[in-house]
Amino acid sequence: MQEEHNYKWVGGRLIYGFGAKGNDAFYSILSGYLIIFITSHLFDTGNKALDNRMVSLVTLIIMVLRIVELFIDPFIGNAIDRTKNSPGHFRPWVVVGGTVSSIILLLLFTNLGGLYAKNAMIYLVVFAILYITMDIFYSFKDVGFWSMLPSLTTDSREREKTATFARLGSTIGGGLVGVLVMPAVIFFSAKATSTGDNRGWFIFALIICLIALISAWGVGLGTREVDSDIRKNKQDTVGVMEIFKALAKNDQLLWAALAYLFYGVGINILGSLEVYYFTYIMGKPKSFSILSIINIFLGLIATSLFPVLSKKFSRKGVFAGCLVFMLGGIAIFTIAGSNLWLVLLAATMFGFPQQMVFLVVLMVITDSVEYGQLKLGHRDESLALSVRPLIDKFGGAISNGVVGQIAIISGMTTGATASSITAAGQLHFKLTMFAFPALMLLIAIGIFSKQIFLTEEKHAEIVAELERTWRTKFDNTTDQVAEKVVTSLDLATPIAGQVIPLAQVNDPTFAAGTLGDGFAIKPSDGRILAPFDATVRQVFTTRHAVGLVGDNGIVLLIHIGLGTVKLRGTGFISYVEEGQHVQQGDELLEFWDPTIKQAGLDDTVIMTVTNSTEFTMMDWLVKPGQAVKATDNILQLHTKA
């Protein structure tokens, strides 16, 4: 039976990975290549002024609607959260959203029967309705698809494997669109032109939309959702206004978001204009595929290189160094002209560090959760982690608007070729493509370098302070014990190993009982189980510690290793979420002991009763040095009369 289960789940991973491929292929053509079709092919009445006016209006409509959609996103999330039916929590939205969005996007790659030439105003209204409908249904599909990952399995290892398949599918899906777009469009076009024609773009869009449609139905029919307590305890979806409020209160989150905003606008504009450069400046649209292939591999290399750089350099150093490297690429771009090798060098220098910049910003935003918790007294994890996707969408929206306008100003609209672009048009284009993004990157460097002080060391200090003060939120918890007339409580160990008195732990804070009395275990395995029925009240983002408030009134902090916050979650797995109720024996955390030892850290697992002052005494039920199994009773706590 186990082999059959594994076989089925491997199939599920493949299907989910294929779903990610279709999802990102769809997003790639929506966010980048629909604009190219609109500016270069859609409007062709022979009246240049009318065509340019339509391009300008349509691209502005897209920009405005994409910004409006940011405020609709929270309602989409809430609608998905409230969905309860037999097919599942997420799969119906993946199928319905994928179907509707694919059909409508394909319609947008047509001239809607020449409607714009008959009545421009009606065309604009119809286009706006179709676009916002398509965008909303795609958001339903996108949110549903990525949110369903935890529901596919309760096994954390399987989640990691499935997520890896999804990331691989996502990289392939988004990257291959860039590789194939111009060769495919030109191949399917009826006319032999350097930019293709309406038929070529429609057939290419048809292929991508079919992939997106089939992959959505594949996920809907080929995966199964598992019900669990984690999903029942899912936090509410975050609204845009709540995000702004969180930014105003958390200065490190605010500055990281601002730096990422300027950076995001810059890279989105330059990235969106690269295909225009190959097409209208160089006259070599097919060569854009070479850049896309290079970027796929460089993205994978950059991601694997990041852990090495982050150990040798500070976050500010990595962030500034990456952006300076990108500025060097922009500088080479300005003198590259039509030299393919110089252009490829410039474009790869610009694209290579982007994954590393993303990871630096993600680390700061993630660490700002604990920073805000210490500063404000409450934890806004969902708010903080909603900031980056919001900025990504906003940057993409601004990019769409700018690209449409610069295409008109530079003369890169319907019927244009590389030879028809004037010197003035090239100058306007290059100023927008190079000077403006360079300015955005310089501003981002300035903000990040001057305002961000949330280093890994600072974050470790914050986590340590939160561990010291965590108990103050749960004073007088033994009142519920007194009501039950309980005079003593047994405290079990959450992990197997050798018992160590707390005073012998190699940490003065724990050893002195500053965080409360308790005991420690030299672990013999890496599974942390709930020692009693309890509610999870704290799960650190580094997954090295968990705080429980027991149904019996005991407030317990379980801390894996000493100095392990520095590992930033590497080698640790969390099976629970804040607010989740667990029963004795449920698995809370898991860690890979060799990771801790290879980092030169102490792997001792420490348990402190942070409300130990509410008990009169603690008696040992086992001898120090004795080997115990998980959930064996270690201490007996006596309540106050």
Swiss-Prot record:
Record PTM Phosphohistidine, positions in chain: 559
Q: Which gene encodes it?
A: rafP
Q: Does the keyword Chaperone apply?
A: no
List UniProt keywords, sorted A-Z.
Cell membrane, Membrane, Phosphoprotein, Sugar transport, Symport, Transferase, Transmembrane, Transmembrane helix, Transport
* GO biological process, alphabetically ordered: phosphoenolpyruvate-dependent sugar phosphotransferase system; sodium ion transport
Where it sits in the cell: the answer is: Cell membrane
Chain positions covered by the region annotation Permease: 1-506
According to the UniProt entry, its GO molecular function terms are: symporter activity; transferase activity
Q: Give the protein name, as stated in the record.
A: Raffinose carrier protein
Q: Membrane topology per the record?
A: Multi-pass membrane protein
Q: What EC class does the entry list?
A: transferase
Free-text domain note: The PTS EIIA type-1 domain may serve a regulatory function, through its phosphorylation activity.
